Amino acid sequence: MKKFKIYLFSLLILISFNTKSFSKGVPESFADLAEKLMPSVVNISTTQTVVTNTNPFPFQFPPGSPFEDMFKEFGAPQERKSSALGSGFIIDEKGIVVTNNHVIQDAEDIIVRVNGDKEFKATVIGADPLSDIAVLQLETKEKFIPVSFGDSDKARIGDWVIAIGNPFGLGGTVTSGIISARNRSIGLSRYEDYIQTDASINSGNSGGPLFDMNGNVIGINTAILGRNGSIGIG
């Protein structure tokens, strides 16, 4: 009976020790880190002119009808304004912003919102469609808080990460998760070595940063796998 008590006591100590060790790897809160990083993350909105052919008939075809596309080419071309949303992050105090190229591609006007309230016009100073990276310059003399960069090669599967961006136009949104996989290739571009995360990623997050727990950028949120988002690739 005495031996059983000793073994039971030892087992309880071991379970308690393992639980404490595991809990050290789980952040109690992301609040302090998010508060520090959010001023460096921006919301991007773009407008561009799109030319489409109109229906030449005075009546509308039923939605999804094959005749709708068939006869559109005979209609008169019509210009309309199209808008898009995305995210980005500041890499220099002089207002230099990095985002995805597909966020600003063919844009006529680019508006960048910083810290949730200040808006600035931006111009493209560099773009590479192959890597899907673009660099913007904010048209202002103000100083900003740039991000710090980490080493994505040191990021491990299972590490905690947070994504900050502008999903659905809801700026300043923070989500968290872990690195689910590395070295993903999904056929998006010539250069592919993506990190997969289960942090919630949705439309408008493109171009936003993926941070490690030290507050360093280790990736750019680029793509969503799945009909309803949530599986992030960057």
Describe the residue ranges of each PLM region:
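Bacterial N-terminal signal peptides
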Residues: 9-16
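Serine-dependent protease modules
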Residues: 22-234
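Bacterial N-terminal signal peptides that target proteins for export
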Residues: 1-8
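Intrinsically disordered, low-complexity regions
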Residues: 1, 14, 64-67
